[in-house]
Amino acid sequence: MAVQLVLNFIIAVFWLFVTNSYTTNNFVLGFIFGLVLVYLLHRVLPGRFYVITLYRIIKLIIIFLIELIKANFDVLKIIIKPSIKNEPGFFVYHTDLKKDWQIVLLSNLITLTPGTVVLGVSDDRTKIYIHAIDFSTKEQEVESIKTSLEKIVREVGEI
């Protein structure tokens, strides 16, 4: 991916020199021209076409921000309630992710959402130990992690 992106920037800068016009519009035109060239050459360049990976990373960021906003509202509801009826507790989340960086990324995303903290990962890397501020919603929490965060982390990892 990095090789393709650097090559695209080199083509865009080369386009500026060839056209002898150093404007932003011309750079964008050169970048689009480079994008087409990199796409035509992506079979001989290492890795998957970088736009696909870039799209997946942007999708990961958007999904995480949505989950972050939802978790903020959940914690806000707990804080605003006059009586405390939440049940904090620990649970084990079983993951299917294989690569270490994917497990670390998922753990960080879980920790960054309010109301949950990852305490550790098992030695065989199949279980993530999580503390939740409201244990009564464990099934919802597991389903939310499985269908959104873990799914998109797996997609980003498919190279």
From Swiss-Prot:
Q: Which UniProt keywords apply?
A: Antiport, Cell membrane, Hydrogen ion transport, Ion transport, Membrane, Sodium, Sodium transport, Transmembrane, Transmembrane helix, Transport
Which GO biological-process labels does this protein carry? proton transmembrane transport; sodium ion transport
Q: Can you say where in the cell this protein is located? A: Cell membrane
Its cellular-component GO annotations read:
plasma membrane
> What parts of the sequence cross the membrane?
1-21, 27-47, 49-69, 101-121
Q: What is its main location?
A: membrane
Q: Which GO terms describe its molecular function?
A: antiporter activity; monoatomic cation transmembrane transporter activity
Q: Which InterPro entries match?
A: Antiport_suE1, Cation_antiport_E
Instruction: Provide the membrane topology annotation.
Output: Multi-pass membrane protein
Its annotated function is as follows:
Mnh complex is a Na(+)/H(+) antiporter involved in Na(+) excretion.
On assembly, the entry states: May form a heterooligomeric complex that consists of seven subunits: mnhA1, mnhB1, mnhC1, mnhD1, mnhE1, mnhF1 and mnhG1.
Q: Which family does the record claim for this protein? A: Belongs to the CPA3 antiporters (TC 2.A.63) subunit E family.
This one is known as Na(+)/H(+) antiporter subunit E1
What organism is the protein native to? Answer: Staphylococcus aureus (strain bovine RF122 / ET3-1)
The uppermost taxa in this organism's lineage are: Bacteria, Bacillati, Bacillota, Bacilli, Bacillales
